[in-house]
């Protein structure tokens, strides 16, 4: 394509037949445009003595003739006359014979290819003067030689080639001396390559002396004509060398290989043009003015001049007189150039892609912003944020404490001055997000209606009268006062008795929002009091989160498992809770994150715990404790029938299906499978039963059989829930001497336990006592007290019985997995020792509890209700309680006490009578 275009262009030029003026003006313009770049120009103008010879193609079909034809008639006079006619670049090739010696111009980089125009900087003042002188006399011709690179130079001048060049010119000046006489020494022309280019000086432009040492310099515009070999130095300062003008070796223009190589060079130049537009101009110019595409040696020179190869490679091309070799070398350089060009284009494209991608995104974002603004959809982020916060905060402004208002205003101010991408902006934004979304005195509506509350509470829970009463009282006080204050109610009881679920019902009864969190195992104070804002990812504590999520300042907050509060290295969460739960302090609760006081005094706190022992004293002091003991069988039946069964059926998708559990089966389920204090296990068992029923129903449905109503009786239970688990609380049907049933109160509720005593060995002075069964310190002390007391007591009851003095005893409390501690086993241990010593079993179905002093007094203990329930569960008929617990027992409801005989004692003597002396 390109070749064709070029040919067309050439034809056009020929037909226009404007060889001289028109072309020269255009070429000058192009030259100006290309500036300092190497410009291809026809190497040799055909002089023929004509004054209009500028830019006339010089070559014939055979390149060999170039020199001869270029040479004829070329003279300084004709050249100078032509310069006056055209005013453009003069191309006139002086005959070799007229230039056996030439001024040597050193080229710091890139050799000058014949046919090419190249600017060269010269700093040698004498050389410049001489050149100017020559030009004034007519045409100036020089020999341009590439400086040898450092490695190949005989000069010791180090550094860059330009430095070498400077050094050379200086040395040349120095070595010539003042009188101009030649001095012995190295040939100054050694620093140049031997093969150079015979060149015409077109222009000499003096440059202002800007170098620090004030050296003169000038730029020469050289047009290469033909190859030269330097033979020797004729004169120094300026350097004049003897030269031999070289001709290209003869070649056969019709040789296939030459043709093919030539074509390939043209094709490669074409390729090169695709990637490098600068070359395009060069070539266009070349093609417009000359027709060298059929002239292989010229083409090779042109191709080489287009390459960015290093000086050595270009010099090699210059030195090759064999046309074929030169074409090959050029082709190699061109191919490399094309590769580099591709790589360059690739890199350029990548960079461009990236830049344009980024720019595109930027423009699109800007556009989006302005579109949004235009449509009023969104103000810019910051303004929108500030507006949001202000809008949220304004309605509350009046109820917010003054100092908090100040903080919020300051923060809003700060936010407006911050850069949205800064981290500070985010911190402030989050802080404002919290500050503005807290309720700040906004209370939720409250239902202070006793009847309604009673209804709601009863609807969800059976029994639990203490808790329900407490809530009703709370409402009553609120009604009378016209306002409610926060309270802290703590429910203590075994698992599964409904502590958590009634918390929820309380909120429902009062019409308040509900929030629950568990502090079991919590060891980090920050969970309650928040992190300081300086921490990355800082958050307020649970209470502030609660206020935000409920949006009111008077929710019911259930703090679960308060007895299992952890204690970590990050401070003591119990103390933090203290601040929260102390009615004196929680009006101005200070969260670390929020840093402004928050009023929590309207919050109704409900805490749950299994035991009270582990709740820190000061915390316990601020709570109202409501005890929930476990349920007896009748209560469980009630709960199961009214609440759990319905829920379990519903969960299994059996609400509409007729499936029932008979009363007997229910009693067995409760009595044999779910004997613990709470009803969670019962709930699980009922769910299990109904899941199995659901499977049956689903199977029947899939086979399209109609199913009769399912009735689950005692015998079916094994199918539904398996065999009843082994019950450890009744090991003995009848207790042997030395074994007594005690009553204990643990985190799981009340339970019966056996205290076993047996003799290990006997002998004079062997009386001792050993205890096992996970007993704590208090219980071990109780054993020691019991042992001492029993010795004395036995003497009074059975004088002469020296069993205790002579026998080493072992007391054990089975159920070794459960840690047991507390003083309430005192009377039980004593009784077991006595029973063994007297070899007399205690009254059947008897259980006892009570602390014993060394003098035999029986002191009251805790957990009477739990113990009573546990005793009943284990089939105990008679219980011995300390006299001090009579009031507790009397408070128990009738159904718990039903069928039980309670004996109240204040001294051990009475215990003895009930337990060991009962049959008298
Ligand atoms: P806790 O918090 O005491 O361990 P939960 O409150 O989780 O126990 O109660 C366990 C389950 O037993 C809940 O589904 C609850 O509804 C049920 N439950 C407990 N006590 C009663 C009750 N008195 N009446 C009705 N359901 C109860």
Curated annotation (Swiss-Prot):
SUPFAM superfamilies tied to this protein: P-loop containing nucleoside triphosphate hydrolases, PUA domain-like, Ribosomal protein S5 domain 2-like
Provide one Gene Ontology cellular component.
mitochondrial matrix
> What positions constitute the catalytic site?
824, 867
Q: Which UniProt keywords apply?
A: ATP-binding, DNA-binding, Hydrolase, Mitochondrion, Nucleotide-binding, Protease, Serine protease, Transit peptide
Biased composition annotated in UniProt, kind: Low complexity: 75-88
- The enzyme's E.C. designation: 3.4.21.53
Task: Please state where this protein is localized.
Answer: Mitochondrion matrix
Q: Which CDD domains match?
A: RecA-like_Lon
| Residues covered by the Lon N-terminal domain | 102-338
Annotated transit peptide: 1-58
Q: Where is this region: Disordered?
A: 65-94
Q: Which GO terms describe its molecular function?
A: ATP binding; ATP hydrolysis activity; ATP-dependent peptidase activity; sequence-specific DNA binding; serine-type endopeptidase activity; single-stranded DNA binding
Q: Which reaction does it catalyse?
A: Hydrolysis of proteins in presence of ATP
Q: Which SMART domains match?
A: AAA, LON
Domain Lon proteolytic, by residue range, is 734-918
Quote any Pfam family the record assigns. AAA
**GO terms under biological process:** cellular response to oxidative stress; chaperone-mediated protein complex assembly; mitochondrion organization; oxidation-dependent protein catabolic process; protein quality control for misfolded or incompletely synthesized proteins
The text of the family note is: Belongs to the peptidase S16 family.
- What does the annotation say about its assembly with partners? Homohexamer or homoheptamer. Organized in a ring with a central cavity.
Sorted alphabetically, which PANTHER family does this protein's record hold?
LON PROTEASE (PTHR43718), LON PROTEASE HOMOLOG, MITOCHONDRIAL (PTHR43718:SF2)
Described function? ATP-dependent serine protease that mediates the selective degradation of misfolded, unassembled or oxidatively damaged polypeptides as well as certain short-lived regulatory proteins in the mitochondrial matrix. May also have a chaperone function in the assembly of inner membrane protein complexes. Participates in the regulation of mitochondrial gene expression and in the maintenance of the integrity of the mitochondrial genome. Binds to mitochondrial DNA in a site-specific manner.
State what protein this is by name: Lon protease homolog, mitochondrial
């Amino acid at each position: 394509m390109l070749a064709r275009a070029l040919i067309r262009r050439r034809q056009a030029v020929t037909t226009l037949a404007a060889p001289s003026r028109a072309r020269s003006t255009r070429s000058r313009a192009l030259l100006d445009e290309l500036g300092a770049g190497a410009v291809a120009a026809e190497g040799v103008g055909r002089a023929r003595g004509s004054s209009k010879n500028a830019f006339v193609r010089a070559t014939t079909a055979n390149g060999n003739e170039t020199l001869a034809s270029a040479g004829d008639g070329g003279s300084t006079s004709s050249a100078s006359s032509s310069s006056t006619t055209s005013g453009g670049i003069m191309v006139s090739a002086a005959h070799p014979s007229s230039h056996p010696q030439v001024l040597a111009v050193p080229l710091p980089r890139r050799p000058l290819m014949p046919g090419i125009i190249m600017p060269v900087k010269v700093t040698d003042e004498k050389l410049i003067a001489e050149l100017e002188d020559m030009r004034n006399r007519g045409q100036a011709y020089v020999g341009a030689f590439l400086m040898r690179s450092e490695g190949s130079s005989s000069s010791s001048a180090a550094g860059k080639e330009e430095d070498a060049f400077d050094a050379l010119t200086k040395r040349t000046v120095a070595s010539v001396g003042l009188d101009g006489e030649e001095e012995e020494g190295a040939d100054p022309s050694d620093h140049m390559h031997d093969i150079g280019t015979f060149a015409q000086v077109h222009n000499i432009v003096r440059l202002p002396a800007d170098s620090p040492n004030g050296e003169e310099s000038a730029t020469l515009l050289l047009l290469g004509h033909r190859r030269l070999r330097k033979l020797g130095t004729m004169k120094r300062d300026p350097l004049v060398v003897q030269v031999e003008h070289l001709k290209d070796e003869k070649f056969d223009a019709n040789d296939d290989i030459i043709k093919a190589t030539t074509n390939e060079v043209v094709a490669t130049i074409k390729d090169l043009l695709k990637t490098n537009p600068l070359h395009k101009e060069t070539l266009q110019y070349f093609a417009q003015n000359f027709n060298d595409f059929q002239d292989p040696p010229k083409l090779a020179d042109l191709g080489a001049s287009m390459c960015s190869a290093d000086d050595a490679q270009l010099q090699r091309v210059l030195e090759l007189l064999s046309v074929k070799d030169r074409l090959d070398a050029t082709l190699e350089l061109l191919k490399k150039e094309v590769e580099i060009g591709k790589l360059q284009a690739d890199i350029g494209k990548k960079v461009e892609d990236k830049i344009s991608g980024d720019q595109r995104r930027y423009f699109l974002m800007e556009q989006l912003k302005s579109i949004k603004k235009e449509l009023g959809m969104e103000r810019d982020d910051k303004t929108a944020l500030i507006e949001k916060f202000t809008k949220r905060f304004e309605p509350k402004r009046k109820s917010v404490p003054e100092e908090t208002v100040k903080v919020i205003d300051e923060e809003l101010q700060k936010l407006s001055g911050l850069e949205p991408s800064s981290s500070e902006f985010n911190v402030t934004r989050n802080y404002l997000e919290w500050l503005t979304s807290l309720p700040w005195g906004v209370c939720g509506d409250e239902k202070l209606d006793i009847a309604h509350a009673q209804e709601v509470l009863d609807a969800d829970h059976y029994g639990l009268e203490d808790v329900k009463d407490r809530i009703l009282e709370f409402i009553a006080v609120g009604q009378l006062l016209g306002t409610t204050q926060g309270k802290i109610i703590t429910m203590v009881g075994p698992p599964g008795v409904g502590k958590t679920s009634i918390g929820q019902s309380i909120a429902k009864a009062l019409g308040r929002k509900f929030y629950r969190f568990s502090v079991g195992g919590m060891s980090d104070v920050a969970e309650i009091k928040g992190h300081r804002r300086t921490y990355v990812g800082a958050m307020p504590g649970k209470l502030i989160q609660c206020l935000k999520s409920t949006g009111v300042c008077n929710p019911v907050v259930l703090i679960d498992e308060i007895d299992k509060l952890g204690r970590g290295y990050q401070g003591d969460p119990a103390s933090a809770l203290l601040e929260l739960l102390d009615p004196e302090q929680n009006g101005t609760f200070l969260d670390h994150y929020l840093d402004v006081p928050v009023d929590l005094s309207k919050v109704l706190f409900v805490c749950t715990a299994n035991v009270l022992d582990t709740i820190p004293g000061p915390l316990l002091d601020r709570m109202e404790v409501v005890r929930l003991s476990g349920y007896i069988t009748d209560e469980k039946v009630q709960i199961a029938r009214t609440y759990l069964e319905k829920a379990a059926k519903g969960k299994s998708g059996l609400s509409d299906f007729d499936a029932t559990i008979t009363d007997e089966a229910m009693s067995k389920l409760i009595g044999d499978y779910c004997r613990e204090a709470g009803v969670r296990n019962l709930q699980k068992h009922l769910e299990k039963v109904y899941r199995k029923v659901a499977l049956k129903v689903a199977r029947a449905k899939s086979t399209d059989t109609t199913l009769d109503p399912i009735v689950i009786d005692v015998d079916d239970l094994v199918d539904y829930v398996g065999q009843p688990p082994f019950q450890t609380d009744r090991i003995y049907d009848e207790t042997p001497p030395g074994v007594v049933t005690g009553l204990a109160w643990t985190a799981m509720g009340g339970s019966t336990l056996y205290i076993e005593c047996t003799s290990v060995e006997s002998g004079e002075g062997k009386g001792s006592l050993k205890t096992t069964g996970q007993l704590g310190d208090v219980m071990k002390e109780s054993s020691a007290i019991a042992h001492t007391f029993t010795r004395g007591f036995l003497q009074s009851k059975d004088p002469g019985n020296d069993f205790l003095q002579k026998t080493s005893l072992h007391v054990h409390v089975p159920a070794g997995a459960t840690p047991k501690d507390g003083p309430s086993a005192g009377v039980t241990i004593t009784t077991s020792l006595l029973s063994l010593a007297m070899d007399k079993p205690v009254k059947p179905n008897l259980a006892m509890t009570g602390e014993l002093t060394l003098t035999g007094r029986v002191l009251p203990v805790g957990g009477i209700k739990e113990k009573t329930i546990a005793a009943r569960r284990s089939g105990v008929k008679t219980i011995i309680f300390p006299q001090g617990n009579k009031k507790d027992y009397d408070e128990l409801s009738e159904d718990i006490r039903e069928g039980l005989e309670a004996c109240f004692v204040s001294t051990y003597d009475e215990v003895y009578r009930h337990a060991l002396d009962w049959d008298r």
